[in-house]
Amino acid sequence: MSVVLDWSLIDDLRRAIARGRALPEVFGDVALGAAFELACACEAGDAALRDAVTRWSIASGVLRSSVRALAGHASPVPDPFGVPTSEIRPAPRDGRDMDDHLWTEHRERFHRSLVHLAGLPARTARAVGGAYAEMADNIISHASSDGSPTRSLVGFRVSSTEFEFAVADTGRGIRASLHERPEHRRLINHVDALDAAVRGGATRRAHAAGGGFNDLHIALADLNAVLRFRTGDAALTLDGRGADRIAARSASPMMDGFQLSVVCRC
């Protein structure tokens, strides 16, 4: 039986690679969030990790596209008015990119796919798309200390039974971002910093709540979803619907940046 590589396997897989253990030759499929995390891990990974990802990429278009997008290679521009099942691209690098027509068209395709493929009401699809855009904007706002671009990617995958979207960067991570405010320097480990940002609304900005994650929670409130947040050596998953989602914190092999993936069951 073919194995799907998703977030539940990704940390154990990275540990196995680091320890030189035997790895699967191929996966039946690679979830979007797992592909993004592997692409980011390759940035600082050793030869064994890069070789494994190269091998798996042969059979996984999602993983192959993720590695290329993180390296800054844009895929061919799709039909602006299409309804794609998936799309992966480099994340916007600055505010001008957020206003660029290619990014706007990408967001509109995601919206159409949510409505026509996943069957979401237009209002819900618009809220999900807005949260997706907010997560992409967070990369620009928080991934580096001086506002310089960092390697990052965004993407979605949609079917009639579920949809995924993910954002990832190789920047400084949540803890370093929060430490710009003195009151957050008490958050000395990554797992506490991650929890404070995602569930507590902590932010590096003095006069703002963590609106990005709040928008995400609001957009997904009525959807049955699994959210995975990962930074430094920490991961946080929220599983379920709205306020009843079950939170689980766990250790993750150390990696720079921040990675988020969302899977919603239609």
Where are these regions (language model features)?
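Helix-loop-beta hinge of the Bergerat
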Residues: 91-120, 175, 182-200, 218
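Long, mid-chain structured domain cores
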Residues: 49-53, 57-119
